[in-house]
Amino acid sequence: MEMPDYCDYDGLGLAALVAKKAVTPLELVEAAIERIEQHNPVLNAVVYKGYDDARAWARGDLPDGPFKGVPFLIKDLGMPVAGWPRSHGSKFARGVVDAEDGGLTRRYKAAGVVPVGKTNTPEYGITGTTESAALGPCRNPWNPSHIAGGSSGGAASAVAAGIVPVAHASDGLGSIRIPAACCGLVGLKVTRDRTPNMPDGFDYALGNVVDNVVTRTVRDSAAMLDATGYPEPGSPYPPPPKDRPYLEEITRSPGKLRIAWSWETPNGRPIDPQIQAALERTAALLKGLGHEVIERGLGIDYRALYASRGPAAAANFAAGMGRLIELVGREPEPGELEPLTWATLKAGRRQE
């Protein structure tokens, strides 16, 4: 398959070609690998290349899911893939290799995707830019001198560069939304446990951290959420059931909505003029579509919110690190964790 043709399709489009036998899953995998080798030296979006496994999976009997045969990338953070390393963007975890797939990994594979590698992340995903000491900086394909955002920066960079049409991502305080905005993609933080990583996942940040994907089209995001967003027995936060498939939902008119917007910033600093202009254009567009659009303040004391949330988040992070320390078999040594990670770990242990 010619490279320009590969980039012309979203994930569902590629799966349709596979279904029609116009292309094989192996050909799609080779196209993705070719683009990794072409773009990754500049972008550093893909930090583990699982080419041999991907080729073997593509040659085998793939599940008949909506994304059958579509190349896929998994964020190198909290998402086990059997036989693949999981560094969490940290020097401390570099030797960790998972023995089996995680719960959500199995759901992605059941959707028919073919994982070809893992994507860049900041250390333990705790910053909004992807520049860890262990993995190096990830760059934005629209302008390599710019950041790709974080913590799912590698996923967003790879999708925006046309390496894959859809990639796994996760989000606690913007880790899907920030890189999606930086790279011009669709990025949705879903309700907690809408896509549970159970039964073997860890409840990071009291359900505040969720998994989903970044994509180039809304329909890919909807279809992947349909494929992975179903209840799991034992999940701590079962979400309300959906009314209908998301792929159907995006074709329906929402009717007239009441939409509030604000250009207040959580830290009280002035908003950038370009962002303010974009907000005003968006508000005008929504009003022109018939919605009721209201400008109003956030009504939230963010300083108080962060002050109360910080200790709980740090304690939860320390508990998660405890699981990793048990897996590695020792405590981290000086130089194996970045300063912010050390500080968060120490703060969390004081809460235990």
Please state what every model-predicted region is:
Residues 13-20, 73, 92-96, 209-216, ...:
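Short, well-ordered beta-strand elements within core beta-sheets of diverse protein domains
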Residues 54-133:
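Acidic/His- and Gly-rich active-site-bordering loop/insert found
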Residues 100-230:
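Short glycine/serine-rich loop segments
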Residues 32, 54, 221, 259, ...:
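Residue-level signal for inorganic ion chemistry
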Residues 1-49, 284, 288-290, 346-351:
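An N-terminal boundary/leader segment
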Residues 189-282, 300, 323, 327, ...:
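A short helix-breaking turn/cap at a secondary-structure junction
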Residues 116, 292-297:
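General small-molecule cofactor/ligand-binding pocket signal
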Residues 67-88, 251-263, 312-352:
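Short helix-loop capping/hinge segments that flank enzyme active sites or metal/cofactor-binding pockets
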